[in-house]
């Protein structure tokens, strides 16, 4: 629409403004249009590969206000990083303000795709309004909600570069799209039942289920105990009724996921509060537009109601609906109530929602792929015809009982990717390919690092192919050819081999970064720190500079340099990698180190391999040494009888953490009266406290700065109460690590300590050690924007490569 013609004014000024950041797909052009109209400005706004370009003409005062409000009043999903400005010649006949077609210049891309967001309250109100033309339409969205990253092929962000391109808008949708006063003004995924994507339900044989409402029939099947594959934003879920133990057991059997915990989806906070402890931080996370899976401390009775969902664990993964389709499932189960009132009330439907990634392969995204890979698992398929362009799992986080800044990522993916992490310096573009487990990749542009969504474990060809796809997608949307390629030291990782191939193909240097150096560097990178730091890297395994298996390290990290200052006592791994899956083997290794190898067979009578393991240890055959902290957790679990073998990675440590938490709730008779340390009164996310006492004289630090926890395991070997032993293990470990770190700080004079590695996913360890060291006056940096585990090391590899790059 044209503005009324204004009189020409010799004091009229025209400027060109370039806005950089997350400014495409978030309603930024409509926002600029409305703002310019309000201020009486003439000109135009358009997307280009670098962000948003604006030419505006009017009074100097109006232009000053425009610049100020571009930042101050930007749409909620936008992020304005930079505003550039230059003067232009005023146009004599300038009149009106318009949104122009997007431009593709030869300039480098400087914008980013927005992240996928949960359906907004305005769209929900329409979704449940029988008088609205989008009533119960599973693809409702607007400029403030809906898919972005997972349906975008390239920039600039226009319908033609998304998977909505095959769906031309009908006249009513076009009218909304072109109406400046409408919240769907230039909403690229805009659609309705007449012109947009649609649903279909298929049976187990892949044949359409005719003459049914797909939503109603899906809910009926779920309530009958069936398993339904449901197509979402970044891939398929496998869903079943969490209350139905038989359905959960069938899902475990068919997916071959024996004990690994499932997440559940509930309708709202009121329902979530029935099953988990929710503080202000958890509530904010559950209802955030990113809609991650949030780990909640289970309430009493959860395991009885949800048998087999998260067996033996203290935490339950919970998420709220984030797509209209998911909301419609709960709406149907509630009897199709009008309005939004029902969303404030507890609802009975609770769904297991697990990623459809059979065999540990990548998440299923396509309809044909689902029919091939999920046949025999799903009893039905709820599909739609909007293509998923970017595979993206649900994110998993844990709150800290406080508001949103205190968040620990366990998996960073949907909702947070591809949000950039600001670096403290610019440099050449670096591509880092991460490690072999929980893989992510990272690509830099100037002072921004773009970490991909979770790729997975590179133990199969399909996941390796997914890594290649992730690299290609980041390069395509950022239009960058890296000048350096970074990778892990391990020569047998696919990520390492592929990094070498890419470096050779592009004729650029390849930079090898030691695994634990990368863990610490990742945290330094996200905190923007260039200063030397003491790194405490605790995880399962990573190849060390000496070719040995590391995993319990004290490091001095100074830019691109890293020096090993100390490590945990090395334990043998009888049977090699098998010891990492069978905690009884690590317990046997500990017994042998105590000089009690003769007890191994009697201690583990159910393990037919016990005699052989005893011989391995005695003869030092197939028992490589490792300083891994993870293996000390396994040894403790094995000695306490918590777990002799594991069904999934980290299970023993997670069960041990749960036992320790449970001991904190019980009366304390029998606890030792003489203690070296106490972790009493530490707040928990659910509002209770965790209390445990450290054992005295339960560790040693030798002249070479090796921390020996064998005395702790000796004490645990005689413990008859597993929960008490687990609590003592955690409390003593925190005390030992505190003493070890403080002694190293005193020697080096470096007073910044950085935590890195998967062991810091342990809530008790991470929170209490952080508090202890902070009380000593030390600065403690922890992972906040990425997981502390291998999901973050690609960023660390990037940071080290940048530090080593010539200025």
Swiss-Prot record:
Record function comment: Involved in the maturation of [NiFe] hydrogenases. Along with HypE, it catalyzes the synthesis of the CN ligands of the active site iron of [NiFe]-hydrogenases. HypF functions as a carbamoyl transferase using carbamoylphosphate as a substrate and transferring the carboxamido moiety in an ATP-dependent reaction to the thiolate of the C-terminal cysteine of HypE yielding a protein-S-carboxamide.
EC number(s) reported in the record: 6.2.-.-
GO BP annotation list: protein maturation
ZnF start-end (C4-type): 120-145, 170-195
UniProt pathway annotation: Protein modification; [NiFe] hydrogenase maturation
The name this protein goes by in its record: Carbamoyltransferase HypF2
Organism: Cupriavidus necator (strain ATCC 17699 / DSM 428 / KCTC 22496 / NCIMB 10442 / H16 / Stanier 337) (Ralstonia eutropha)
Tree of life domain: Bacteria
Gene: hypF2
Start and end residues of each stretch annotated as Disordered: 663-682
């Amino acid at each position: 629409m044209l503005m009324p013609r204004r009189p020409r004014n010799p004091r009229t000024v025209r400027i060109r403004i370039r806005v950089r950041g997350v400014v495409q797909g978030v309603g930024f052009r409509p926002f600029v249009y409305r703002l310019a109209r309000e201020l009486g400005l003439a000109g135009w706004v358009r997307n280009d590969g670098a962000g948003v370009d604006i030419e505006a003409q009017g009074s100097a005062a109006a232009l000053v206000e425009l610049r100020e409000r571009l930042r101050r009043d930007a749409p909620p999903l936008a992020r304005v990083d930079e505003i550039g400005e230059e003067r232009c010649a005023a146009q004599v006949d300038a009149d009106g303000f318009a949104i122009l077609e997007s431009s593709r210049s030869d300039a480098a891309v400087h914008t980013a795709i927005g992240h996928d967001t949960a359906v907004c309250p305005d769209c929900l109100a329409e979704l449940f309004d029988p008088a609205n033309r989008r009533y119960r339409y599973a693809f409702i969205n607007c400029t403030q909600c809906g898919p972005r990253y997972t349906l975008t092929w390239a920039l600039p962000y226009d319908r033609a570069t998304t998977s909505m391109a095959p769906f031309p808008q009908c006249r009513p949708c076009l009218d909304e799209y072109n109406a400046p006063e409408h919240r769907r003004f230039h909403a690229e995924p805009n659609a309705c039942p007449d012109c947009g994507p649609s649903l279909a339900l298929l049976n187990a044989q892949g044949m359409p289920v005719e003459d049914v409402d797909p939503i109603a029939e899906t809910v009926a099947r779920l309530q009958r105990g069936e398993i339904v594959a449901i197509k979402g934003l970044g891939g398929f879920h496998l869903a079943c009724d969490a209350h139905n133990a038989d359905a959960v057991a069938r899902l475990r059997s068919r997916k071959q996921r024996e004990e690994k915990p499932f997440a559940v989806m509930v309708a709202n906070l009121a329902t979530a509060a029935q099953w988990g402890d929710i503080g202000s931080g958890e509530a904010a996370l559950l209802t955030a537009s990113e809609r991650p899976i949030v780990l909640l401390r289970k309430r009493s009775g959860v395991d009885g109601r949800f048998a087999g969902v998260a067996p033996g664990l203290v935490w339950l993964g919970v998420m709220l609906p984030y797509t209209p389709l998911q909301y419609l499932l709960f709406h149907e189960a509630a009897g199709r109530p009008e309005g939004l009132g029902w969303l404030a009330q507890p609802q009975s439907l609770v769904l297991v929602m697990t990623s459809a990634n059979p065999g540990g392969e990548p998440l299923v995204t396509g309809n044909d792929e689902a029919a091939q890979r999920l046949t025999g698992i799903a009893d039905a398929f709820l599909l739609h015809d909007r293509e998923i362009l970017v595979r993206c799992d649900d994110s998993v986080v844990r709150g800290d009982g406080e508001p949103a800044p205190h968040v620990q990522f366990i998996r960073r993916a949907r909702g947070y990717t591809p949000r950039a992490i600001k670096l403290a310096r610019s440099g050449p573009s670096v591509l880092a390919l991460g490690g072999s487990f929980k893989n992510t990749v990272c690509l830099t542009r100037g002072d921004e690092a773009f970490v991909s969504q979770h790729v997975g474990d590179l133990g199969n060809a399909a996941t390796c192919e997914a890594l290649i796809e992730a690299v290609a997608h980041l390069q395509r949307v950022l239009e960058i050819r890296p000048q350096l390629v970074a990778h892990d030291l391990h020569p047998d990782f696919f990520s390492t081999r592929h990094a070498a191939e890419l470096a050779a193909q592009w004729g650029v240097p390849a930079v090898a970064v030691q695994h634990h150096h990368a863990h610490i560097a990742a945290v330094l990178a996200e905190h923007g720190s260039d200063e030397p730091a003491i790194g405490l890297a605790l995880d399962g395994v990573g190849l060390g500079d000496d070719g040995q298996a590391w995993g319990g390290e004290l490091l001095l990290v100074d830019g691109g340099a890293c020096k090993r200052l100390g490590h945990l006592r090395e334990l043998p791994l009888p049977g090699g990698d098998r010891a990492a899956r069978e905690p009884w083997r690590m317990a046997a290794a500990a017994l042998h180190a105590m000089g009690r190898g003769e007890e191994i067979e009697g201690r583990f009578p159910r393990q037919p391999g016990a005699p052989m393991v005893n011989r391995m240890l005695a003869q030092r055959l197939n028992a490589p040494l490792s300083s891994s902290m993870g293996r000390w957790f396994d040894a403790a679990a094995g000695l306490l009888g918590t777990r002799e073998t594991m069904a999934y990675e980290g299970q023993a440590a997670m069960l041990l953490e749960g036992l320790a938490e449970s001991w904190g709730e019980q009366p304390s008779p029998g606890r030792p009266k003489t203690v070296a340390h106490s972790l009493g009164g530490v707040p928990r996310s659910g509002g209770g406290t965790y209390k445990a006492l450290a054992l005295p004289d339960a560790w040693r630090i030798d002249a070479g700065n090796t921390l020996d926890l064998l005395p702790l395991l000796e004490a645990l070997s005689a413990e008859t109460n597993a929960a008490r032993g687990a609590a003592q293990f955690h409390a003593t470990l925190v005390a030992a690590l505190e003493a070890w770190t403080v002694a190293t700080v005193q020697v080096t004079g470096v007073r910044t300590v950085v935590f890195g590695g998967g062991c810091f996913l342990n809530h008790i360890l991470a929170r209490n050690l952080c508090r202890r060291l902070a009380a000593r006056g030390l600065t403690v940096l922890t992972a906040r924007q990425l997981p502390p585990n291998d999901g973050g090391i690609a960023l660390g590899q990037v940071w080290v490569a940048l530090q080593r790059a010539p200025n």
